[in-house]
């Protein structure tokens, strides 16, 4: 990974919002997922720094970005407000925007509300909602992994009561993490160890858990005017092909790419495919 700069600025309400800058070329703003997880999980974004100047946001309350005073201020509109402040800070009339997972939901909200500010949009392993069809696909993907040696503990973690402390949340998140991969072995476990000790923001996860049952962006997606790439892993257990198909159908002119042998962590599972598809789209 190349050297990167950790930069930041003060938001209108006095918080510090930080981002990591690396690479050279046209600016690509990336909003990571989680929520509440360290953006370190994205690594160098599949080497896209070789083609673009990456601006990888530390969303509010994660990484080096301040937590808001209100522990409930982690709604999608809060994140999109921060994204707009970042655009203004960068001095860009329009941005190329990549949203990953939860960050992809933020990117949808932003691009639908401010279509004139988005030049190109990449929606990676994300969804417009988690309705019955998406939930059925998730359950089928979970059952498909039932023969794996890690399955029993990972599945049990998802059935437990909501943890109270950030450390307890970290334990639950990482126990369940194998589901995010098409195949989970020593290499994937080693990757998790590279950011396992990063702080987790439980407030952000709790707000998301409360907000996601009513999430449904389908009526807004026609407002998106930017050329859009929807990309996910074939084996993604939470935002897989069912989610991608719905997004692609709802966003005018959107292009869909399904990456084989990849799950929710497609950016680290199949970095070459992810890099090539995203770079080709952004430079076409």
Where in the sequence are the language-model features?
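Conserved HGGG/HGGXW glycine-rich cap/lid loop of the alpha/beta-hydrolase fold
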Residues: 8-72
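Acidic catalytic loop of the alpha/beta-hydrolase fold
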Residues: 235-239
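Short beta-strand/loop motif that positions the catalytic acidic residue
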Residues: 224, 230-232
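Alpha/beta-hydrolase
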Residues: 150-219, 226
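Flexible "cap/lid" loop of the alpha/beta hydrolase fold
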Residues: 121-160
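Conserved hydrolase catalytic core segment
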Residues: 93-137
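Catalytic active-site module of serine/aspartate enzymes centered on a nucleophile-bearing elbow/loop
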Residues: 254-284
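Active-site loop/oxyanion-hole signature of alpha/beta-hydrolase fold enzymes
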Residues: 59-102, 276
